[in-house]
Amino acid sequence: MRRKRSRSAAAAAAIALLCGAATAGGGNPIAAADDSLAAQGFRTQADGSRIVDTTVLDERNLRLQVYSAAMGRTIDIDVQRPADASSPRPTLYLLAGAGGGEDTATWQQRTTVLQFLAGKDVNVVQPVGGAFTYYTDWRSADPALGVNKWQTFLTEELPPLIDRALGTNGTNAIAGLSMSGTSVLQLPIAAPGLYRAAAAYSGCAQISDPVGYNFVRTVVSAGGGDTANMYGPQGDPLWAANDPYLNAEGLRGLELFLSTGSGIPGQWDTLDGPYTLPGVGGLANQLTVGGALEAASNYCTHNMQARLNQLGIPATFDFQPVGTHSWGYWEDALVASWPILAKGLDLPA
């Protein structure tokens, strides 16, 4: 028990140092860590979740290890601190695609958006994990993907820990691409008031119709998972219950941005380009698989536009005439979405 307590105290002190936790008279921040906002993040919550460790990567970045009681395992959380952390700042939850940030297909490795966001007064929080899960609560454990209660983790367990550890102002936005382009619409519906803005890049909101269902099944099966363990067989009521298109009323009041390409090759679809996998095979995959996925996303996003218009819910839609399901277009989309996210976060555009 003493060893565990010491580890948590050291980790709390590390966050206190990075987050600029002040001490009276310029005293030792390690000695004061238990009284700091950072240390509070290490207190076990009523649900059993807690921050168990942290690694400071540099003066702006750290990795937290957060125990999820709902899933019974520890999740890595990458954090980029604001340009100015002298006062409480808002938080942008930035989700990965199908790989869950566990592979090389990450915002850090494929884009420069972290550098772009480094100039903003916002905490950027990226969960590492959840590959092929849609960041949702699965109805049962999956033989390949295990126990998944990502909705519970992202909406109930993680935010209060982040708020206490980083001393945020409690204002949140969420953004994601491809697989998580669906999740970032589901999560605000599931947790009203948690987020003020959401941006979905190349997602598919309409998951319970045949096109959307097959889109989800294709992604989940790529990781060896079975969607029957997620929401049940096709037509099960859980599919409709988790469909952002059908439940779009829950998005009212949010600042919304949705974007997609057409599936037709564009400027970032070039041989050995900066956003293309190496070689002819990499480009061919981007043009064929990436083209088909983006065309499906385009279909879903147009339908979502019609749905929001029907409900009188304002949103910004960015339909590009070209573009495949690939990183160059997602980087462009995130930059384009920043004014919308910033408005929700009460930050300058």
Which residues fall in each region the model found?
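Non-catalytic cap/lid and distal C-terminal segments of serine-dependent acyl enzymes
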Residues: 2-13, 19-349
